[in-house]
Amino acid sequence: ELAKVVAAAGIEPADDPSNRDDRFDRARIRKAIAGADWLDVPALAVSAANLADADAALEWAAAREWSECVTKGPMGYTYRPQAPRAVALRVLTRIVTELDGSVPRGSAVARLFESLVARQPASIGGLVARAMPDGWSVTKAPVRRA
């Protein structure tokens, strides 16, 4: 459908053969959705809008948690988590991104969170995190000598 809209606008649509390759989840899912006559498209649009609202609320809460519970020190950040898990994951993601320069995978941040809750040290990217008495400390990992 999008290709038709783009073509009608006078733009040549890109053709990515992997979009039709069943080895990829996205191709299989698109085929399944296309054949699902029971799918209520307007209800999906409402659900998507609700998810966008929830995402905005989580972002707002994470920004507030950051300003109230995160301090920057000479070696990294200390985070004194007060918010629910979903918010804390976003705060940890921001800390890792700020220190490491790249956005970590969600599953890696979730593992980091679980380790810190269990008061176990953990690493993510080039960083090390520890549960300290005054909060969670996230710093650059020491340089390894060869």
Predicted regions and their residues:
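Catalytic subdomain that performs nucleotidyl-dependent activation
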Residues: 1-48
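AMP-forming adenylation/ATP pyrophosphatase catalytic core
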Residues: 46-146
